A protein has these predicted regions:
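Conserved alpha/beta cores of soluble small-molecule-handling proteins
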Residues: 1-120, 136, 142-196
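Short beta-strand/strand-turn micro-motif
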Residues: 122-128
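A short acidic/small-residue loop/turn micro-motif
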Residues: 129-130, 145
Length: 196
């Protein structure tokens, strides 16, 4: 079995969304290993020395296997290619990204991919997405991975879930890419950046 991963954003000595990472880590462990003592990530990491944007990568199975702190730079993205895969599964954040990597390799001249499953928009290779019609941001109701930043934005009402098919893309003006490391609003592209 592959290891599971939590990726935590650290900047100015502060770790973000620890409660949501704790929830996902412990619900993953409960699902795969049964009822075991919960782990509190907050007691296991020390963000204080890291002033610049840093990725804290926690690998785990039943227990924590490793904790790494890695300087992080956001990869520039200005174009997306739609790719279809009706069998892809990535409900749990694991080290096994074989299918996603294969799809990413098919991006051709584009910076990233936007994955379509059963005619519904899901995620890019590393980000959840949201679409803006100029008034509201809509997030695909069936992402490949329910990311912690996505959950945070849903709880705050910043984004709302919606069924978004490939035919719906043209109804929107912008797409935002975000994840635990990339804040909402840091990557916003015109809808024309998607190769349909």
């Amino acid at each position: 079995m592959s290891l599971f991963i939590e990726t935590i954003r650290i900047i100015d000595g502060k770790a973000f969304n620890i409660d949501l990472h704790n929830q996902r880590l412990n619900s993953t462990r409960l699902h795969f290993f049964g009822k075991i003592a919960e782990i509190n990530i907050d007691n296991m990491i020390d963000p204080s020395p890291y002033k610049e944007l840093t990725k804290c990568r926690i690998a785990y199975n039943k227990e924590i296997v490793s904790i790494e702190y890695i300087p992080y730079q956001i990869r520039p993205v200005s174009s997306l290619r739609l790719v279809k895969d009706n069998t892809i599964e990535y409900s749990w954040k694991t080290t096994n990204r074989e299918t996603i990597n294969r799809l990413f390799a098919s991006r051709q001249k584009y910076d990233d991919i936007l994955i379509v499953k059963n005619d519904l928009i899901t995620d890019t290779s590393i980000c959840n997405v949201a679409f803006s019609d100029g008034n509201r941001w809509k997030n695909p109701e069936k992402p490949l991975l329910k990311g912690t930043q996505r959950e945070y934005l849903l709880r705050r009402g910043t984004i709302q879930e919606a069924r978004i098919s490939t035919d719906d893309i043209s109804k929107y003006k912008h797409i935002s890419l975000f994840n635990a490391m990339i804040g909402f609003g840091e990557i916003i592209l015109p809808i024309t950046s998607i190769n349909i």
